[in-house]
């Protein structure tokens, strides 16, 4: 429960701060136009739609819901699976191996992806402004009514493949934590989380673009391979990295905030637990 609360708090805090960049990233990913807008142009377009900076927080509620739920569940499942796999190898000196980290984070990622995919479908559609959902609840209702279970799991295959991004990130993060011989400081946590996220993002970002486009499209005949070929034909290799700048500007600070809050909240619970014993 402590891990879930820490993860939920971390996910909520980071999403509240970084939402405008997520909005820009989704809109850039969803665009199939050959002429790409810059990050500044996307912000300007959103603000110009109603003349208020509040437009940059369009869809905030569904984003907070998804991030809080996914991070809370992820850290809880990851911590549980990590303890299980480590207990199966008693001669590990208390250190988790690369394979154990990949297995634990991969398992947690698959479970969370299955649980939260409908939230991300509604989020992608609200933030891309391709549909006129008045609120997230109407979005879920419309999605289930018109597209059923298949619509709820649009983009699920790339999400599962994208689990490897989280696995790569946690593998790098755990190894960096072991590299620090002393107790890590807040600055150490920021550096380790940023480095691990950049490492994973560069390798796996094209899957996020394909996932967003599958979720935004409402055609029942959407195909991953057709979308990959269409993106390559119309936009080339750069098409698979549309929105990468706002993605990095968002996820690196967001990951730093998430992991720092998670580690600090987790440390608080450990301290309180030791005092009560």
From Swiss-Prot:
GO terms for cellular component: mitochondrial inner membrane; mitochondrion. The keyword Nucleotidyltransferase does not apply. Solcar repeats lie at residues 1-84, 96-179, 184-268. The chain crosses the membrane at residues 3-24, 60-80, 102-122, 152-172, 190-210, 240-261. It is a multi-pass membrane protein. InterPro entries: Mitochondrial_sb/sol_carrier, Mt_carrier_dom_sf, SLC25A32-like. Keywords: Membrane, Mitochondrion, Mitochondrion inner membrane, Repeat, Transmembrane, Transmembrane helix, Transport. GO terms for molecular function: FAD transmembrane transporter activity; folic acid transmembrane transporter activity. Belongs to the mitochondrial carrier (TC 2.A.29) family. This is Uncharacterized mitochondrial carrier C27B12.09c. It comes from Schizosaccharomyces pombe (strain 972 / ATCC 24843) (Fission yeast).
